[in-house]
Amino acid sequence: MSKTRRLLLLAILLIGVCCGVSAKTLVAYYSFTNNVRTIVNELATQKEVDVVEIQPAEEGLDYAANNYALGTQLLNAIKTAPNDAASYPEIKPVSADFTQYDDIIVATPLWWSQMAAPMQTFLFNNGAAMEGKNIWMIVSSANSGISGVVADAERLIPNGVFQSNKLWIKSSQVPQAASMLNTWLVETGQVSAINNQKMVVLSDPHVMAPGLLVSEGTAWTTYLSGQRKLVDYSQRLFDDMIVRIKRDLRPGLVLISGDLTKDGEQVSHEYVINKLDELRAIGIKTLVIPGNHDRGSNSDAVYYDGESTTAATVATNGWFATQYANYGYGVGSEREGTTLTYACEPITGLVVIGIDSGTDGNVSETTLDWVVEKATAARASGKKVIAMMHHPLMPHFAGVDNFVSTAVVGNYETVRNTLADAGIRVVFTGHFHTSDIAKDWNADMTREIYDVNTGSLISYPCDYREVTMSADFTDMAITTGRIADEALPKRIKVTDGNHNVTFELNETSAAQSLYNMLPTTKEVQNYSTNEKIFYPETAISYSSDCIEGACPAGTLALFSPWGNVVMYYGDASQYPGLYILGNAVEGAGQISELTGNITVSKVEIAKERLNTAVKNQIAAKGTAYSLIAPTAAQAFVIHAEGNETENASAATTLSTLVSAAEMGKAFIGEAKAQELKDMASSMLEDKSQYGTDRENVTNDLTLSIELPEAIKLAADGYSTYCSENRLDISRTTGVTAYIVNNVTETTVELQEVSVLPAETGFILKGTGNAWYDLYKTEGVADDVSGNQLHGTLTATLAPLNTFALSTKKGVTGFYPVNAGLMIPAHKAYLTATGSMARSLSIDGEVTGILNVDSYVNAIPAEFYSIHGVKVARPTKGIYISNGKKVVIK
């Protein structure tokens, strides 16, 4: 067989082809020392690419032996006759459809200042097919420059569009390849830059280190049998999530709200940290908080070895903080003593407070005081504050503690009120393994607070959150993504009503084609003595990625000449056109029993496991509960999917549960029956704070939240302010805004306003030392054309004749300040002639004395009450002095 034909036989399956999406970038690489392979493997996690590896036809050749004697010989042969195919060493067959691609990345090592010989063979054979393609170069070498490699590529791809920015990674730089690749990909426009206005929020990945499963056996299967979590897929799901973050989401910050590991095993934590290091290498920051499964004694923290288990070493608080120093517990963070609660500013202007709710779901009063202190300090600096905590902040439906005793943080009302009063508007939580957002308020219902509970990465539906922030962090847009569909293996179920077989499909295009046309009902037929067959709804599409081979019992295959699907219950040998689709994982022995019409449907691994686990959990409560367990489990699945009221099955499921609770009164009592009704209604109508004046429905999957600007008024109840945003003061209770519409020699006349244009200086009046939230608006602003206040968005040097709002000896007014002093950011000042301080006059009514300086420096000798009675020692109040009304505060 000719070399050219061999080059067209073997394909490496391209992800885009399997999924029915045309890929845009092909990476062709050759690696001898594994350096280029390492680089390309990392590249594939940062950019969606299809990869083909170039391999010598003869295995085991040592090109480096005897000072690269063989490698030099091959290069010399090419140099001698570069246009002769016989000059190039043979390589294993490679197939690639170049018409699919706009961009081709050639990744190769350098041999003696030239391109490695096997890569030259590949380009010699395929260079013409790369005409008009964008050609990118990645070269690895010890020290030599790469110009010779580039020259070889340009010779072998004469009509390629070579890109000027080549990436040269020296052998010594391979450990830094992730960072170098990211920089190169961003600079060349192949991927988007890391977005510091975006966060990704994960929770409860429960990663189990591969080494904990020494060997499969009853110890492992017994543990799994009661799980609703996909612990057996935890590594796969976490790995895929890390790739999605690096390649697709590219946020500036990742938050993980606890239960990082299966049960606190140090080896599992080490696995998690290694993956987080991948994010850090390309500039993505991560902050974590521990959950109840992450440290301390846990009987499930074991190695599984056949029928036995051995205890694994678990993390302590100190060990956890040390190991996660780069992820919340190191430089740049403040910790509350030796606890695992901390505060940091991962992105300028955004402070994150990680609250450790312990293994029992409690937050101490001392910790709460510390959190308030840090939140207050951050707000005083004009920064936005969010928090994360493992245990949910509030109940998300009535009776939630019937599912998990620690479903809500202990003393939750106090925690809720404290955080809300401290100006924390959003808390990201986990623990309950469902993605549900609940809203509540502080004690007097003047401040909103949201509990954004994110589901477990290994529990259906395997959710994560994507959070996009406005540039000033005043707007937060939350969306919800799911990882299971792409990360978990594809399974299908074949049943005739009495016999069931579950197959796990491989990743070939033919298997994907079958999966995409399900569900379907077909007649099963006997064929030969070892197989059952059926004809799919439409022809299965397949490509060169299909797998031929022997088919042992339990194999699912496509017989392409006839287009039928084959289920083997006896061994079969390899046959031309017989392509393997997958293998039975359950019920292989029932294939031979299938008869009549069969239904072939998709199996949702995560959903099925959750449904089964919850059903068993409820049934275990007793006979009466077992009767409603299937429906109750369905209700919980609907809840896990979020936005329950949009689910077509929710109303029917609720009606069934309410009826069942009513009929079950005789067995469980009226109180318990009502509790079940409330739980079902709250859950399936998506109502948090059910049955109270706080009851509300909040979108669980897509939500925009305002993070208002905050200002603390001075002790006298006045402050100046200036914002980048248009503000609607009418939305804020208890505070009034004013602009200055006239300045005289003795007074500053104020005019009340409601909607202020952006970058407008103004005065706020309210309760002294109180915090107020200020909200953005798109509404029409008031006319402030006559405003004489100058706002500052950044710290500004005071010009000549500057006056600032202040209180001296109990008198509030505008006092002169020295030129050159710094006016803080987001404040306002006046400029006026003279050096006399000015009083405040609101709507023509003087609220301070006419001559502030005179009052401060020497109190007038005579004061009279408004009724004309002379007052020898005036206290706070309104008086007449020198024929003018004055106010003493």
Where are these regions (language model features)?
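C-terminal outer-membrane/trafficking sorting elements
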Residues: 21, 739, 845-889
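Acidic/histidine-rich helix-loop elements
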Residues: 66-82, 206-238, 301-311, 324-331, ...
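Extended active-site neighborhood of metal-dependent phosphoesterases/phosphodiesterases
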Residues: 266, 270-373, 445-448, 453, ...
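N-terminal active-site segment of His-dependent metallophosphoesterases
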Residues: 193-266
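N-terminal beta1-alpha1-beta2 submodule of the flavodoxin-like/Rossmannoid cofactor-binding fold
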Residues: 24-106, 113-115, 179-186
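Binuclear metal-dependent phosphoesterase catalytic core
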Residues: 436, 444-488
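A short, polar beta-strand/turn micro-motif
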Residues: 706-733, 751-847, 887
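His/acidic metal-ligating clusters that form di-metal
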Residues: 233, 238, 243-253, 285, ...
